[in-house]
């Protein structure tokens, strides 16, 4: 399930997905940046520029990504919170958004894992960004998270 909300010029995306895995297995997968390749659409040309290390608070991760054809952008995030194996937060340090804060949480529910994502984001360029980019970014993020959900089902529902 993917839902969007817009309040005070900050958009919020929420998604939940049940997976037949343990907390440990979910943490091992989601806390490793190298697995982002497996759940990001190929057309985004996603590339991580930093070494893959065990996640820790304060960790900086640099990426290159193409959110739109022929448009490549650098993106730097910082891991600002880690509670293994239940939650972590990454925040944009620099990149395409005025604000990007992605909270990942994992909990057991009916002998399955419930993976929850809450992404708070603010578009650049103020009113112009919201008028011209709001619907486009919402559409893109929806497609990205739909793809991610399908890939996670393929990986873990074998």
Predicted regions mapped to residue ranges:
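Beta-strand/loop substructures that line and gate deep hydrophobic ligand-binding cavities in soluble
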Residues: 91-143
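A short, structured loop/turn motif at beta-sheet edges
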Residues: 22-24, 54-55, 80-87, 105-114
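Glycine-rich portal/gate segments that line the openings of hydrophobic small-molecule binding cavities
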Residues: 47-94, 147-155
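Hydrophobic ligand-binding cavity/cleft-lining segments
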Residues: 1-56
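Generic structural detector for well-ordered beta-strands
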Residues: 14-20, 47, 64, 78, ...
């Amino acid at each position: 399930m993917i839902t969007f909300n817009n309040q005070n010029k900050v958009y919020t995306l929420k998604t939940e997905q049940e997976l037949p895995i343990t907390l440990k297995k979910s943490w091992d997968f989601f806390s490793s940046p190298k697995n982002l390749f497996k759940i990001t659409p190929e057309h985004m040309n996603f590339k991580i520029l930093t070494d893959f290390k065990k996640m820790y608070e304060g960790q900086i991760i640099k990426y290159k990504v193409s959110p739109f054809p022929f448009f490549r952008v650098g993106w730097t995030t910082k891991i600002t919170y880690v509670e293994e194996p239940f939650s972590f937060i990454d925040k944009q340090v620099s990149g395409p958004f005025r604000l990007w804060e992605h909270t990942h949480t994992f909990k057991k529910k009916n002998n399955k894992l419930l993976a929850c994502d809450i992404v708070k984001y603010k578009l650049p360029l103020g009113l112009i960004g919201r008028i011209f980019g709001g619907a486009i970014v919402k559409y893109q993020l929806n497609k990205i998270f739909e793809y991610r959900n399908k890939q996670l089902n393929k990986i873990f529902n074998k």
